[in-house]
């Protein structure tokens, strides 16, 4: 019998949730995803020093302002790492817009255009890029405009059905509903332990997946943020799953039969009218877990972006 990872690949597109090139070589995923925390982690790998130096030297040619140089170097480093990863994966790389822009639609769009241009200058077509945006109302609206321009987006930090529905209604290419962080919240809130089947994160992704298929939405569902392989195995059949290196290794070393749990069924109903902004904000606000985890996720990505910029500022000085 093939290992669990090999079996999973027959049901689901496997994506590596890492900026570590060695891990990507080892597990041969279809796509890869990065975020500010992963870029910060990758920047500390000695083999990546040349990518940082290239970003620093490029930024110095773009502006005399140290603040602008720091911003430019951060963008260029994210793209440099993405370019290296694209040499190893046949599919796409997800590169994230600065989390501090999560409530600014226009600046998110502008940042996306900048990232796409940096990739283009490096010889990478936009068809291999997914622009990652937080699933705020502003992020979803930015994604809607970018999708209309032919720039595909990955809406991340997604914790609620309201966010998922709004993304589908906006015509977003892909969503990343988080599994493990939902579990974290419920374990802390209730004091309970959960099986893989009753895991609130697994239940959430399953509900979103079934809703999309039943209503004929084309938005790709990519489960993310896993705490254990039980969650992953329970979502076998999801369009895509983005998995960190430690859990990829555990799956590769696990011999257990994988059964497809999520199965796409033909659309059985027409989609409802799109949520208005007021409806979205109210329904989202009614979910305390989603409110807490979205805010926390944005804060933590912003903190790691800040740490990265401190490192870049030191090198620019």
UniProtKB/Swiss-Prot annotation:
CDD domains, A to Z: Transaldolase_TalAB
Subunit and partners: Homodimer.
Compartments, record wording: Cytoplasm
The keyword Transferase is annotated on this UniProt entry: yes
Similarity comment: family membership: Belongs to the transaldolase family. Type 1 subfamily.
NCBIfam families in UniProt: PRK12346.1, talAB
Disulfide bonds: none
Involved pathway(s): Carbohydrate degradation; pentose phosphate pathway; D-glyceraldehyde 3-phosphate and beta-D-fructose 6-phosphate from D-ribose 5-phosphate and D-xylulose 5-phosphate (non-oxidative stage): step 2/3
GO molecular function: transaldolase activity
Purpose of the protein: Transaldolase is important for the balance of metabolites in the pentose-phosphate pathway.
Pfam families on file: TAL_FSA
Record EC number: 2.2.1.2
Keywords: Cytoplasm, Pentose shunt, Schiff base, Transferase
Principal subcellular localisation of the protein: cytoplasm
Listed GO CC annotations: cytosol
Positions annotated as active site in the UniProt record: 132 (schiff-base intermediate with substrate)
Lineage: superkingdom: Bacteria
Enzyme class: transferase
Protein name stated in the entry: Transaldolase
SUPFAM superfamilies the record matches: Aldolase
């Amino acid at each position: 019998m093939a290992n669990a990872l090999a079996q999973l690949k027959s049901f689901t597109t496997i994506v590596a949730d890492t900026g570590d090139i060695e891990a990507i070589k080892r597990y041969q995923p279809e796509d890869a995803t990065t975020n500010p925390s992963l870029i910060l982690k990758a920047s500390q790998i000695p083999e990546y020093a040349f990518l940082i130096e290239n970003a620093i030297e490029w930024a110095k040619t773009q502006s005399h302002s140290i603040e602008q140089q720091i911003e430019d170097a951060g963008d260029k480093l994210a793209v440099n790492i993405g370019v290296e990863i694209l040499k190893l994966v046949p599919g796409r790389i997800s590169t994230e817009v600065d989390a501090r822009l999560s409530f600014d639609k226009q600046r998110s769009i502008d940042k996306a255009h900048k990232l796409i241009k940096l990739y283009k200058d490096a010889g990478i077509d936009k068809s291999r890029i997914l622009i990652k945006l937080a699933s705020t109302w502003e992020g979803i609206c930015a994604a809607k405009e970018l999708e209309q321009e032919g720039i595909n987006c990955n809406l991340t930090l997604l914790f609620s059905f309201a966010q998922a529905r709004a993304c589908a209604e906006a015509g977003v290419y892909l969503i990343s509903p988080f599994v493990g962080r939902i579990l974290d919240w419920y374990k802390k809130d209730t004091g309970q332990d959960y099986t893989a089947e009753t895991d609130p994160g697994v239940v959430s992704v399953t509900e979103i997946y079934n809703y999309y298929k039943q209503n004929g939405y084309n938005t790709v569902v990519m489960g993310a943020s896993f705490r254990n392989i039980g969650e992953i195995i329970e979502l076998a059949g999801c369009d895509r799953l983005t998995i960190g290196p430690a859990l990829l290794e555990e799956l590769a070393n696990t011999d257990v039969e994988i059964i497809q749990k999520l199965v796409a069924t033909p659309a059985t109903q027409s989609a409802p009218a799109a949520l208005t902004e007021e409806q979205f904000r109210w329904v989202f606000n009614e979910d305390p877990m989603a409110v807490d985890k979205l805010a926390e996720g944005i804060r933590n990505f912003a903190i790691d972006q800040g740490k990265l910029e401190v490192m870049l500022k030191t090198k620019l000085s």
